Amino acid sequence: MKFDNEQLLKYIGACTSPYHTVDTSLQMLLDSGFIELSLEDEWQLDSGSYVVNVFGTTLFAFHIGKKPEHTLRIASAHTDFPAIRVKPNPITSMKGYTKLNVEMYGGLIENTWLDRPLGAAGTVVLKGKNAFDVDSVLVDTKRPIAIVPNLAIHMNRSVNDGVKLNRQKEMLPILMMERNNEDNPTKPLNNRNNPSLFSESDTQYDEWTKFLADEVDCDPSEILSYEMTLYPTEQGCVLGTEGDFISSPRLDNLTSCFGVLSGIIQARKMNANGVRCAIFFDNEEVGSRTKQGGAGMILPNLIKRVYDALGYSNQEMDSFISKGFMISSDVAHGLHPNYPEKNDITNIPVLNKGLSLKIACSQSYAGDAKAIAIVKGLCEEADAQYQIYVNRSDIPGGSTVGSISSAMLPMRTIDVGLPLLAMHSARELMGAADQEQLNRLMNHFLGGK
């Protein structure tokens, strides 16, 4: 059966913020028969499949087979991606224009965000019963509400020579035109659901707060805080005269999330033995040093809770970890035909030739000789095409969560990922044949013997 890339594109289209990545993935797992657990409850576990929402932006799913002591396997990915985030108190004005004050999340290629219709997605936190009991609501505009316009070439003759953008000045999106007191101050954005929602006293709230209140269908006074990401509203697509490529936002790292999801669902379908886990971390793009990131204690704590609930001792758990294996999945740099000199001279991943095994003696990518050999064997058993990726010696590459998380949970780990062009652009490019190869590996690793 031919692999359906439309399912990948549908998934990416739904995952417009880390919160939505977790929500979409969680629903897929629940639909597949996983049972949701809470971090706040005591766990009573038996053979079966379970999932835990960790602080809204990280997700942990696991399957326990008939013989939990058989093997521990973990696959990881990350839910976040380079983007524009809205600051608190974001409204600023200039000569009749209303703009959003924003900051850059991660290492995005800034000029690729210019002139793109932008939607907004994330979470809005509302007043609850008391200070500790608040309500969180997911928001996705699903339509463009803002744009960062370029400066015309007639006003910037050197633009094609390369222009450095000032993030605080030139990356602020336009939201609307200012209204005076006689105009409806929220007409362009609000009143979509309830034209009479606001009273004259609502002038104490800025246009962004009013807009969010309309999206949530609440009074502006109920909004306490938010985490909102701006995202390109243009959908991903298959392209090329022979359909060889996929162009889409957020391929880094939703391709990995999609592959790991496939694997943990396969573990349930096959009732795989041992303990098979999938962890989707947040904050990889900003260093992982958070409570929900790969550099935190969340994964070791979750693994301990699983084995504690199954009645194993700490010494037995340490033994399972030392014998276990983890695959960390994050994208790699494919050969760019216009910049071939940017890749290594002998380890050159090409689009549509399979996933990349990422190797670095600096350990910016996790792995050792045995881990590399193991994952090669897994790829061969799964009939998953693979390549080797190593950075050029004179161009330092990025890092990812594999080495970070394995330092917190000492087990053999390898970094893999699909090769991309234009990584961290507002739209990235991948080979249309490659997602199937990653899914094959993850299905075999988590769902196999």
Regions found by a protein language model. Give the residues of each.
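N-terminal hydrophobic/helix-forming segments and targeting peptides
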Residues: 1-449
